[in-house]
């Protein structure tokens, strides 16, 4: 009987853990200045302010018109949906090489530094075509944060 109880507990933990991750998607900031609040309402105090349009964030929860987000550095809070959009960006978590084509054998165009905000145009397999200030090219998706 104890074994059956343990099996049920493990099953439910795995099942509910999977459900909680299903709501996690990446979003981006619509504006250059976005308030992050302690709670999911305009009456909640402002916790901090983001000042970077297109910054990717992970949505981890939702309540009515607010989304709970977490950033690359594990800062979290609530943002109104009017300030968010479908993610079109990512951040390099390590220095990366930008290539002309989606292969490591292609001509290297530039070195992308860790922390650089990247605008994602499209992805194929484990490569994404990105733009970053002066450069446009392909980058491997490993060590990139913000991709759905």
Each language-model region and where it sits:
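Second-shell loop/turn segments in exported
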Residues: 40-44
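N-terminal secretory signal peptides that target proteins for export/translocation
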Residues: 1-4
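Sec-dependent N-terminal signal peptides
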Residues: 6-16
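SH3-family beta-barrel domains
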Residues: 20-38, 48-53, 60-101, 105-134, ...
């Amino acid at each position: 009987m104890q074994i059956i109880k343990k099996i049920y507990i493990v099953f439910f933990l795995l099942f509910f853990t999977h459900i909680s991750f299903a709501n996690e998607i990446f979003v981006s900031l619509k504006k250059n200045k976005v308030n992050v609040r302690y709670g999911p309402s305009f009456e909640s105090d402002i916790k901090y302010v983001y000042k970077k349009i297109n910054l990717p964030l992970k949505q981890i929860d939702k309540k009515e018109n607010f989304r709970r987000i977490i950033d690359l550095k594990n800062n979290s809070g609530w943002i109104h949906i009017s300030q968010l959009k479908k993610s079109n960006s990512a951040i390099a978590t390590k220095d990366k090489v930008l290539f002309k084509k989606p292969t490591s054998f292609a001509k290297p165009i530039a070195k992308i530094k860790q922390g650089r905000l990247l605008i994602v145009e499209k992805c194929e397999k484990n490569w994404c075509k990105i733009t970053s200030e002066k450069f446009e090219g392909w980058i491997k998706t490993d060590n990139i944060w913000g991709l759905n």
